[in-house]
């Protein structure tokens, strides 16, 4: 998942979307 889709990708998972080197991470 790219950075642009990260917030939507992490939505509903009660996580904070972060982006490192173009990689989306959903951090609780």
Swiss-Prot record:
Recorded hits in InterPro entries, A to Z, give: Scorpion_toxin-like_sf, Toxin_alpha-KTx_8/9
The molecular function terms in GO held by this entry are: ion channel inhibitor activity; potassium channel regulator activity; toxin activity
Tissue-specificity statement: Expressed by the venom gland.
The answer, when asked if Secreted is one of the entry's keywords, is yes
- Predominant localisation class: secreted
Q: Got any disulfides in this one, which pairs?
A: 3-19, 6-24, 10-26
List the GO terms this entry assigns under cellular component, sorted alphabetically: extracellular region
Cross-referenced SUPFAM superfamilies? Scorpion toxin-like (SSF57095)
Q: Which UniProt keywords apply?
A: Disulfide bond, Ion channel impairing toxin, Neurotoxin, Potassium channel impairing toxin, Secreted, Toxin, Voltage-gated potassium channel impairing toxin
Q: Tell me where it resides.
A: Secreted
Domains: what does the record tell us?
Has the structural arrangement of an alpha-helix connected to a beta-sheet by disulfide bonds (CSalpha/beta).
Q: Which family does it belong to?
A: Belongs to the short scorpion toxin superfamily. Potassium channel inhibitor family. Alpha-KTx 09 subfamily.
Cited function: Blocks Shaker potassium channels.
* The protein's name: Potassium channel toxin alpha-KTx 9.10
Q: Which organism is it from?
A: Mesobuthus eupeus (Lesser Asian scorpion)
């Amino acid at each position: 998942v790219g950075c642009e889709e990260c917030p939507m990708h992490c939505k509903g998972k009660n996580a904070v979307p972060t982006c490192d080197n173009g990689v989306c991470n959903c951090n609780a």
